[in-house]
């Protein structure tokens, strides 16, 4: 006997994961508040029909109506799971008997009194398949049924049930089981069956079942039927379920984290050599990206049951989530999702999978905001890895220090020609902009990276208006958290309490700092020797300019870039159409 039939619940207490339905039904039964029509809705295989039979059993129990049937009376025995049934409980499959003639026959039979039970119960399964004429034939008897008659409608699409019928029922929505509840159910059944199942098999079975207890038990039944020595191994489950080996997923994610094209396409080759479906691999890769995003956003996602994986796999996934930024993972998921849509019905899914991998490796091939954020994130990571810890620099002698510091202090009166009580002008802010950026860098390196390409445009009341050539970065800079960082940096550098707003536009002609020529002349007069800090700053500014450039080299067609990468990495040859 199939597992889902063998372990079918016999009472509301045995129904798993539907407490929001079984609890109010039990209270209503014990209190004697019985309605003449019920509507059970929800996804397939979540217990609607089984609960309808339990409700009929509870209503007709000799000690009922009760939420806990005795199980020994004639009605309880006949309505037990896998029992022959009762003459007073009629099940109608509306998928094959949903016409007006079938419902008229049911209506005529409904007026007869029950033979040996308290109620005559009609269970209409797949109720959404009943035609409009059939529902109209039932409408009058559902509105004003005899006292002994109860209808129970079960459907996966309650919106297709006639509204006049639906409004006269008590509607109970069923739902799918969460992974943690499903895993406990599977472990209990495997223990009762005396079968040992590897821990890595449970996530595969739960994912294949899609949260439906019936479908999940069917998958588990298939694995138990083919298990040798009552032991279900991870390797056997992979072969039977057609799931991609987690090692191949790890290889692909590690290659993406390292931007290693050869390793990524090598993983694709292993997928094809192993006989895996490219579409299934793309689906499993998308699910991995989802798990990494959740782990990065919710560190305790595993303990909450949001991410279901073995402990060793969770350690690898946490390491991968730490190596790849959130913006990069989001773009990876978007690209793979779009690729899955292109693979649907494709005759060459492998080629499309390789093109998707090429897009993953080339964020510059797209001008979308997610690709721009990924490029900024990459440059920020490079900055964190390349900038060493600050080292102590030996101080120059007093004689050498005098000619350096003295010219630098002379231009200061130029910045404040007005009385000290007045606030700085736009020109003063432009001249002090490098200092402001240094203050921003101390608070948020991400915000400072996004300032590359931003210029000071104007000062409106107490609001400093910036202009950025990139619309996505302008929106990011205008967000509250980034605007607060800029306001605090301005307060430290200039002693002002200003708000900051960033707009999109071309840099103003007057964006160059006022008094810049004097500063340059002073720098030339001093002519200090290049230091490690100045070289480091030059490298920083170069990378930041690369991140924030508004008008990069002309965009290339993403398909052309992907094909070029395939030619360079795999030696592919392009075949033009005849």
UniProtKB/Swiss-Prot annotation:
Q: Does the keyword Lyase apply?
A: no
Ranges for the region named Disordered are 389-423, 525-559
Q: Which keywords accompany this UniProt record?
A: ATP-binding, DNA replication, DNA-directed DNA polymerase, Metal-binding, Nucleotide-binding, Nucleotidyltransferase, Transferase, Zinc
So what does this thing catalyse? DNA(n) + a 2'-deoxyribonucleoside 5'-triphosphate = DNA(n+1) + diphosphate
Q: Which Pfam families match?
A: DNA_pol3_delta2 (PF13177), DNA_pol3_gamma3 (PF12169), DNAX_ATPase_lid (PF22608)
One GO biological process term: DNA-templated DNA replication
* Positions bound to ATP: 42-49
Quote the cellular component terms of the Gene Ontology held in the record.
DNA polymerase III complex
Enzyme Commission identifier(s): 2.7.7.7
- Any one GO molecular function term: ATP hydrolysis activity
Positions bound to Zn(2+): 61, 70, 73, 76
Q: Where is the composition biased (Basic and acidic residues)?
A: 402-412, 536-559
Does the record carry ATP-binding as a key word? yes
Misc. comment: Was identified as a high-confidence drug target.
Cite the record's note on assembly.
Interacts with the beta sliding-clamp (dnaN). DNA polymerase III contains a core (composed of alpha, epsilon and theta chains) that associates with a tau subunit. This core dimerizes and associates with the clamp-loading (or gamma) complex (composed of gamma/tau, delta, delta', psi and chi subunits) and with the beta sliding clamp dimer to form the complete DNA polymerase III complex.
Could you tell me what this protein does? DNA polymerase III is a complex, multichain enzyme responsible for most of the replicative synthesis in bacteria. This DNA polymerase also exhibits 3' to 5' exonuclease activity.
User: Which protein family is it in?
Assistant: Belongs to the DnaX/STICHEL family.
Under the heading NCBIfam families, the entry gives: dnaX_nterm, PRK07764.1-6, PRK14952.1
Q: What's this protein's name?
A: DNA polymerase III subunit gamma/tau
